[in-house]
């Protein structure tokens, strides 16, 4: 009987690896270990945000599925508004959404005006943090929910703190709660393709002066570490008609992105009671891309005069859907090649990096 030719070191390594992979696959199922090229996320499944500029800034067209995302910012900056738009977009695509309202503050009528089908929206108003995160975990494990929103991390009070005496401190309890929840949720979320969004608030660090940002988010470092996308949303201007304010100009910075390049931004208007102004955003992006010409207070799209005054043109685009779609197609084509980026500060770079987790 002829002897098998001796294998070269490279062939022996390849055979050993193949045997190990086959054993792992038999024991833990197909896909337990694979080469990155076997499952390359060229087209990452996403949920649109309701903002054209933000979808483009995220690099993949929206919030990635099967990942954890964090939306944080100061009070009244538009965090919940943006999240409700994401819910509306998910429902429009036929998805099932759940809203874990730890703050007990969801405005149902406002959600309807933003396009959310509240009759189909699953809502939970938990009593304490562990209950909220357990409900979120069970919804994800069901595999039947496309989007779970937790509003907000700051309201996820540990049960021990809730049942303790007023003034009694539970040092690190909130951070431990979030760390434990993230470890449980991450693997389940990836397998289920559910997108989980945590809304978070900003707090001021105690005793920080000089170098470094005095701001931080609540809940410790675990959420920063496990989030694939982190969005910093800020109100940068109040929109006024004479003396009466009717909305706010808002900037969203992508300070962390594991699915596309970070440090991109989007600017849009949030109109009180109406949410993100898609027509207003298209007008701004069209001017930036030189698709819409502005001469003084007059606006034109090619040879077509759109009108005089920004608000009148915005109203026109709200009514004329065909015209809006034409402008949108050109804007998306331009910004897909020329994304709006910002120069990151030291704080932005720190936010984009995974923090060191402590047990």
From Swiss-Prot:
Entry GO terms, CC: cytosol
GO MF terms, alphabetically ordered: ATP binding; ATP hydrolysis activity; ATP-dependent DNA damage sensor activity; damaged DNA binding; single-stranded DNA binding
List of residues binding ATP: 73-80
Subcellular location: Cytoplasm
Alphabetical list of SMART domains matching this protein: AAA (SM00382)
InterPro entries documented for this protein: AAA+_ATPase, DNA_recomb/repair_RecA, DNA_recomb/repair_RecA_CS, P-loop_NTPase, RecA-like_C, RecA-like_N, RecA_ATP-bd, RecA_C_sf
UniProt KW keywords: ATP-binding, Cytoplasm, DNA damage, DNA recombination, DNA repair, DNA-binding, Nucleotide-binding, SOS response
Predominant cellular place of this UniProt entry's protein: cytoplasm
GO biological process: DNA recombination; DNA repair; SOS response
SUPFAM superfamilies: P-loop containing nucleoside triphosphate hydrolases, RecA protein, C-terminal domain
Similarity field: Belongs to the RecA family.
Function description: Can catalyze the hydrolysis of ATP in the presence of single-stranded DNA, the ATP-dependent uptake of single-stranded DNA by duplex DNA, and the ATP-dependent hybridization of homologous single-stranded DNAs. It interacts with LexA causing its activation and leading to its autocatalytic cleavage.
Protein name as catalogued: Protein RecA
């Amino acid at each position: 009987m002829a002897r098998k030719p001796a294998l070269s070191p490279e062939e022996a390594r390849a055979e050993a690896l193949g045997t190990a992979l086959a054993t792992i696959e038999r024991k833990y199922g197909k896909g337990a270990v694979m080469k990155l090229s076997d499952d390359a996320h060229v087209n990452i499944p996403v949920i649109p945000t309701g903002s054209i500029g933000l979808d483009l800034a995220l690099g993949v067209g929206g919030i990635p599925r099967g990942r954890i995302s964090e939306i944080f910012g100061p009070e009244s900056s538009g965090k919940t508004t943006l999240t409700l738009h994401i819910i509306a977009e998910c429902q429009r695509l036929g998805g099932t959404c759940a809203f874990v309202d730890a703050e007990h503050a969801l405005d149902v009528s406002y959600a309807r005006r933003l396009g959310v089908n509240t009759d189909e929206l699953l809502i939970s108003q938990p009593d304490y943090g562990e209950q909220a995160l357990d409900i979120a975990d069970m919804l994800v494990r069901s595999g039947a929910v496309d989007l779970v929103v937790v509003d907000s991390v700051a309201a996820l009070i540990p049960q021990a703190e809730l049942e303790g005496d007023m003034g009694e401190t539970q040092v690190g309890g909130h951070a431990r709660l979030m760390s434990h929840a993230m470890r449980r949720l991450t693997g389940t979320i990836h397998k289920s393709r559910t997108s989980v969004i945590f809304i978070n608030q900003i707090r001021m660090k105690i005793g920080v002066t000089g170098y470094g940002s005095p701001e931080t988010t609540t809940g410790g470092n675990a959420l920063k570490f496990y989030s694939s996308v982190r969005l910093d949303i800020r109100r940068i201007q109040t929109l006024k008609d004479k003396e009466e304010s009717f909305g706010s100009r808002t900037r969203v910075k992508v300070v962390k992105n594991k699915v596309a390049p970070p440090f991109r931004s989007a600017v849009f208007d949030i109109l009180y009671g109406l949410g993100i102004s898609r027509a207003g955003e298209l007008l701004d992006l069209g001017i930036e891309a030189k698709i819409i010409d502005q001469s003084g207070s007059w606006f034109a799209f090619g040879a077509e005069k759109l009108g005089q005054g920004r608000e009148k043109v915005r109203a026109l685009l709200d009514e004329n859907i065909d015209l809006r779609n034409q402008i949108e197609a050109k804007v998306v084509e331009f910004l897909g090649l020329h994304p709006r980026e910002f120069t990151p500060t030291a704080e932005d770079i720190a936010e984009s990096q995974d923090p060191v987790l402590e047990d």
